[in-house]
């Protein structure tokens, strides 16, 4: 994942 998954909670 190139995006912060922890921030999206996804």
From Swiss-Prot:
Co-factor(s): FAD
E.C. number: 1.3.99.17
This protein's record includes keyword Nucleotide-binding: no
Catalytic activity entry: quinoline + A + H2O = quinolin-2(1H)-one + AH2
Subunit structure: Heterohexamer of two alpha chains, two beta chains, and two gamma chains.
Function description: Converts (3-methyl-)-quinoline to (3-methyl-)2-oxo-1,2-dihydroquinoline.
Protein name per the record: Quinoline 2-oxidoreductase beta chain
Species per Swiss-Prot/TrEMBL record: Comamonas testosteroni
Organism lineage string: Bacteria, Pseudomonadati, Pseudomonadota, Betaproteobacteria, Burkholderiales
């Amino acid at each position: 994942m190139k995006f912060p998954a922890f921030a999206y909670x996804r």
